[in-house]
Structures are given as C-alpha cells and as structure tokens.
C-alpha cells in the first residue's frame, strides 16, 4: 500500500488472521508511508502452505526486507504471533527498524501453555473456526468490543473466507 519510495512500515498479523487485519490502518498510513502487509504461511491466501516456525518466517521476511526495502524499515509492528516474529527479527538485526511495536506476544517460551493451546485447537477447532462459529463471533464483536474495534463489512468478508480455512495443526 502506498508509494514504495516512502519510508517502509511492515505490519505482521497474528495467528488465524491475514493481511486484512491491518487493512484500515494500511489505508490511513499509506498517505505517508509504504505499508507492507505480509500474509504468514498457513493463513489467508497462504492457507495451503504449512506454517513451519517463527524462525523460518523471520528468514522469509528478512529476505524480503533486504531485497525490497534496502535492509531497513521505518517501523515494524506485530500482534500476537506477528509480535513474536518481530522479536525474532530484532534479535537477528537490532537496527532493522527505527520503531517497533509488539502487542500481545509471548516474550519467553511457555511450553505448558503451548501444549494447552495445541490440545484446545485439536479438540475444539471445528467449534472455533467453522463458518458458523465465525458468523457467531462476528455477531458478538459489536456487543463485546468498542465500536471502532468491530470489523467493518469488508473485513468481515475476509474473516468469513479465511478463518474456516485456517489449518488446525
């Protein structure tokens, strides 16, 4: 999004979402920045490509940044899984970006939580990620979240398309 000669901002989505999670922000930021919204393997349009690891994803994004952004970003942002990838990128190259925003990410390994999450998705994934569950979640959003956090219609369509395709491994 935006002119690729402007300062680069990369926004990395969390697990279960895709680039569209940052669509509203990208449209606003693109007036002054080149906004990059990668889709992680196993998500969105990349749902058929297995997500392997944070490290492999960091390798892929680092290559992209080297090839298309001169090896440097103005800002690097990530939420949840995206934030963990941001931390991995910054561990490898601390001067990769001028600004970093990390939200809702684990800062140190939590193997018990990981096992619990894997088991929960394995046991209840069909209840959490089915089209019916996604429609129900979208109906609850306006009731549970501040109005500005609820997905607009355009993003709801992406959500309904992509969430049921999310691999449950």
Positions of the model-derived regions?
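Conserved HGGG/HGGXW glycine-rich cap/lid loop of the alpha/beta-hydrolase fold
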Residues: 1-47
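Active-site micro-motifs of SAM-dependent methyltransferase domains
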Residues: 17, 42, 83, 107-108
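Active-site loop/oxyanion-hole signature of alpha/beta-hydrolase fold enzymes
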Residues: 36-77
């Amino acid at each position: 999004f935006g002119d690729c000669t402007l300062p680069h901002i990369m926004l990395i989505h969390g697990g279960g979402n895709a680039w569209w999670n940052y669509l509203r922000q990208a449209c606003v930021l693109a007036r002054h920045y080149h906004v990059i919204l990668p889709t992680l393997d196993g998500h969105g349009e990349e749902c058929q490509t297995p997500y392997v690891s944070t490290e492999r994803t960091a390798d892929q994004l680092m290559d992209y940044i080297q090839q298309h952004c001169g090896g440097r970003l103005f800002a690097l942002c990530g939420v949840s899984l995206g934030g963990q990838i941001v931390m991995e990128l910054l561990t490898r190259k601390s001067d990769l970006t001028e600004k970093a925003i990390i939200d809702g990410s684990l800062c140190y390994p939590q193997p018990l939580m990981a096992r619990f999450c894997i088991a929960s998705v394995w046991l209840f994934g069909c209840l959490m990620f089915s089209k019916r569950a996604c429609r129900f979640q979208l109906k609850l959003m306006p009731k549970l979240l501040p109005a500005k956090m609820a997905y607009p219609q355009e993003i709801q369509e992406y959500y309904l398309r992509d969430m049921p395709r999310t691999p449950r491994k």
